[in-house]
Amino acid sequence: FLAEGMADTVRRAVNPQLTLGPERGGAQFRFEVPEGAVCRRENLGGMEVATCTLRPDTRDEDLRYLTQAVAEGLRCVPSRTSYCVGAVVALPDGRSFTGYTHETSPTHHAEQEAIRKALDAGAELRGAAIYSSMEPCSQRKSEPESCTQLILRHGFARVVFALYEPDRFVCCRGAQTLREAGVDVRVYPELAEGVRRANAHLGR
């Protein structure tokens, strides 16, 4: 679970008197703190208890930006050959850039539009977050690079979306590919209904 980034918090209780076997030289057992974790230690009943937060609580911020991305998706002109999607690029310095499907080009996806605006403004995208109303595509026919590849190429640290892409046009594996590459991927299905409304022209 730790290696796959599937845990937000880890709590470990260790008896400080516990030692390893002779083959380990009788070394005292210690809890290895995960890299990047913020830990609080306390002593409870003679046990050394470490509570480590692996990922910060970003729910409020995520929902705010993701709600904005869903609203951007409603600005799309409906098409029978593509989804109406909205996206927001959020930088650590507080700046953000929005985009929606086909905003400036009939082949551009929402993520492309938002990323292009950020780059035009001279933004450094490595370590930034991108919010998309729908899972970033992992393959496409209209352009040589998928949104998942674009996100990885620019070094985004986090990807947040509301709805997994249905298998209507292609079989999307964007979230899986991003997670395997070490990107922090979070999904908020409570906002998915707004994405479905934006794509009602395609049916359920």
Residue ranges and their predicted role:
Residues 3, 7-22, 27, 37-38:
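Short linear motifs in low-complexity or flexible loops
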Residues 46-78, 140-204:
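Zinc-dependent deaminase
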Residues 99-115:
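N-terminal beta-alpha supersecondary unit
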Residues 92-96:
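Short, glycine-anchored, charge-dense loop/turn motifs used at functional sites
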Residues 111-141:
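Mobile, glycine- and charge-enriched loop segments
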Residues 84-91:
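Short beta-strand scaffold segments in enzyme catalytic cores
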Residues 3, 10, 69, 110, ...:
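Stable alpha-helical structural segments in soluble proteins, enriched in small hydrophobic residues
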